[in-house]
């Protein structure tokens, strides 16, 4: 089989080649040039495992990716197109339609990419959602500000990673946003709507992650973000951006799982899909939808999930897509059987991303000997310069911790955070 794989993210986060039990399959890998963090030699050696590897500038909007995939189809006939990341779900669905390949369709995937359509659909399904509006003109923002009052929250309709998010707390913030956020992509042309606004919810943020197989929810679990919100301005200097799983005794565990089930029932997920649902939880335990994604959560959520449940969500999704392409009902049944016993985590897990502090990195601990640290990596190199956190998942390393309950887990995370930063030297 000929498999096209698309990802904006670091390819070393995925073990695509080793996930294939049958080496007769060909993988054509399409990457963002700027997500490749290894040396040229390391990347060359990595590339030898694939039929073809191509990397691009301007990855999200580079039409050469579509062009090259069509060329590959002419030469080899593409059997399967997989995307690992929110940024590729529409591109992948359009290519599937063009090439008449099975998989998720654009008319459904749009609800997971366009946040205005997402929230309109949620409201139509009676899912609690903050008030919101598309920003088609500056007047839309002024009207929303006058109706809701500050604070409000402006964000892109389709970006991820808290990029270009902005909290508006007063009229000065409003005027700054009005002067800067309605720029056209092409000089001397009108602004085309790519932003939205919603009421700012003063609440804690949680997320629920898991896997759907054959349109059936197989595994899911809730976690709490370590930061109160994902406003980029607020988290740029925080040391502990990440999340930690709730345990069974937390009074929010069951309500959050039930909320996720309602989302999954009402949103048009493809029959095999990972999911990442972000919610606000107020002090009175009211739950409101922030966003829903038909992909594995970002940061190190997949590694956290693996430490807790012993399964790799991305690997399972890869194998499900491959089985579906081969019409291998037996393999899909085996995966469902494997997941049937995973009702609760074996360990409660959490992670944090090491903040790329402004300055020049000098040194840091390369190994962690805490028994409760399931995975640790420091990726910064001596002499490397950083400008601070540029999006919510930006990092120069990470740690994944485990604990027998929620309290122990959070204590372990705090201890690891302190240890990591006490060993980092920079100037």
Question: Predicted regions: what is each one?
Answer:
Residues 122, 145-167, 186-203, 208, ...:
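ATP-grasp fold ATP-binding core
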């Amino acid at each position: 089989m000929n498999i096209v794989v698309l990802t904006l993210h670091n390819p070393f986060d995925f073990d695509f080649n080793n996930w294939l039990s049958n080496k007769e399959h060909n993988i054509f890998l399409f990457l963002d040039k700027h997500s490749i963090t290894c040396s040229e030699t390391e990347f060359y050696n990595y590339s030898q495992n694939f039929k073809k590897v191509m990397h691009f500038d301007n990855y999200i909007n580079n039409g050469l990716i579509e062009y090259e995939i069509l060329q590959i189809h002419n030469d080899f006939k593409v059997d399967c197109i997989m995307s690992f990341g929110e940024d590729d779900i529409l591109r992948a669905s359009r290519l599937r339609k063009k090439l008449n390949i099975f998989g998720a369709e654009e008319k459904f995937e749009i609800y997971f990419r366009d946040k205005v359509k997402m929230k309109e659909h949620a409201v139509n399904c009676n899912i609690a959602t903050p008030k919101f509006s598309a920003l088609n003109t500056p007047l839309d923002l002024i009207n929303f500000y006058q109706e809701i009052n500050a604070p409000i929250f402006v964000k892109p309709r389709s970006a991820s990673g808290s990029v270009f998010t902005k909290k508006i707390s007063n009229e000065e913030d409003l005027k700054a946003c009005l002067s800067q956020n309605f720029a056209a992509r092409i000089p001397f042309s009108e602004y085309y709507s790519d932003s939205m606004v919603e009421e700012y919810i003063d609440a804690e943020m949680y997320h629920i992650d898991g896997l759907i197989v054959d349109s059936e929810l197989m595994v899911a679990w809730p976690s709490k973000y370590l930061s109160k919100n994902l406003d980029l301005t607020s988290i740029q200097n925080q040391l502990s951006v990440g999340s930690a799983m709730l345990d069974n005794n937390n009074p929010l565990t069951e309500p959050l799982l039930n909320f996720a089930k309602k989302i999954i029932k009402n949103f048009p997920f493809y029959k095999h899909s990972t999911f990442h649902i972000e919610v606000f939880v107020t002090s009175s335990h009211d739950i409101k939808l922030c966003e829903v994604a038909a992909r594995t959560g970002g940061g190190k959520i997949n590694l956290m999930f693996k430490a807790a449940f012993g399964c790799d969500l991305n690997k399972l999704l890869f194998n499900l897509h491959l089985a579906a392409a081969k019409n291998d009902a037996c393999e899909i049944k085996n995966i469902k059987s494997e997941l049937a016993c995973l009702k609760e985590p074996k360990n409660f897990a959490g992670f944090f991303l090491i903040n790329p502090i402004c300055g020049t990195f000098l040194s840091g601990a390369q190994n962690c000997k805490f028994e409760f640290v399931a995975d640790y990596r420091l990726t910064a190199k001596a002499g490397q310069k950083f400008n601070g956190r540029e999006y919510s998942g930006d990092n120069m390393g990470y740690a994944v911790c485990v604990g027998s309950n929620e309290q122990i887990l959070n204590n372990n995370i705090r201890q690891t955070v302190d240890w990591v930063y006490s060993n980092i030297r920079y100037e």
